[in-house]
Regions:
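Hydrophobic alpha-helical segments, chiefly the membrane-spanning helices
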Residues: 264-270
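N-terminal amphipathic/basic leader segments beginning at the initiator methionine
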Residues: 1-35
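Gly-rich Lys/Arg/Thr-decorated short loops/hinges at beta-loop-alpha junctions or inter-strand turns
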Residues: 3-10, 41-48, 82-94, 185-190, ...
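Active-site cavity-forming subdomains of large catalytic enzyme subunits
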Residues: 97-252
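A short N-terminal beta->alpha junction/helix N-cap motif
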Residues: 9-13, 31, 48-56, 195, ...
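Long, structured ligand/cofactor-binding scaffold of large enzymes
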Residues: 34-143
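Conserved small/polar residues in nucleotide/adenosyl-binding loops
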Residues: 253-260
Length: 270
């Protein structure tokens, strides 16, 4: 397979005399001569400071970018939005929650579709951005990988977000004091990562891995860990493999998803 075969889409954007203006703009964001002969890998980051689930994803995106470049591609990072159900629930803000999933899917489809990315790697770690990213990749149906941002570390005495909700209930019942409630509030969520339990994000991560859209063990790694860094770096080699063999989401998720997400064993011929 030639280099041109690996960049069937981006070659339309950057090859030939007529595309000199496009190349000129890409040079401003760091492209050099050799980069125009590499497959372009769109890296969709859901980094945001609106929620701890995604506050570290900018660093993961940089690791993914390095992995893509080292594997012979050219990584291009871009951002898509994210919101937090955990923060907005019970308020008018939840009216935007489900809609955000569609906006995220639209964003991936719009950016990578517009810019001519040959492959796509998305990074997410919250209730709506994870399915939204998958929807965007499926719509474009180009070689794609999802990377889970990873789970958060527990607070003292194995506390997590549920501990805070329970403390609110205990406070209402008179079994948790003001001081105890404040202490749990301040310590239960110590840093980056998705809610520490089999809630929506970790469940989605497991389902996505079962579908074959993320690398093995991606769903079981801490947000801040050497394993998660290696997961990000390995994605570059994996996306190049998908490009070389023209493996796309729709070609395998429709076979794996219904059975694997239910925990059923796949037939040996699958």
């Amino acid at each position: 397979m030639t280099d041109k075969d690996l960049r069937k889409i981006s070659s339309i954007v950057v090859d030939g005399v007529e595309q000199a203006p496009s190349r000129s703009m890409l040079r401003a964001v760091g492209f050099e001569d050799g980069d125009f002969k590499k497959p372009q890998i769109g890296i969709a980051s859901t980094w945001s400071m609106v929620t701890p689930c995604n506050m570290h994803i900018n660093k993961l995106a940089e690791d993914v970018n390095k992995g893509a470049d080292d594997a012979g591609g050219k990584g291009i990072i871009y951002n898509v939005l994210t919101i937090s159900d955990g923060i907005s629930m019970g308020t008018e803000g939840m009216k935007y929650s489900l809609v955000s999933r569609e906006v995220i899917a639209d964003s991936v489809e719009t950016v990578s579709g517009c810019m001519g990315h040959d492959g796509i790697i998305t990074i997410g770690g919250c209730d709506k951005n994870m399915p939204g990213l998958l929807m965007g990749m499926a719509r474009l149906n180009r070689p794609s990988i999802f990377i889970y941002g990873g789970t958060i570390q527990p607070g003292p005495n194995h506390t997590n977000i549920i501990s805070v909700f329970e403390a609110v209930g205990g406070h209402a019942a008179g079994t948790v004091s003001d001081i105890e409630l404040k202490n749990i509030e301040e310590t239960a969520i110590p840093g980056p990562g998705s809610c520490g339990g089999m809630y929506t994000a970790n469940t989605m991560a497991s389902a996505i891995e079962a579908m074959g859209m993320s690398l093995p063990n991606s769903s079981a790694q801490d947000a801040i860990s050497r394993e998660k860094v290696e997961d990000c770096l390995s994605a570059g080699e994996a996306i190049m493999h998908l490009l070389e063999h023209d493996i796309k989401p729709v070609s395998y998720t429709h076979l794996r998803a219904p059975r694997d997400q239910r925990g059923s064993r796949m037939p040996s011929s699958a």
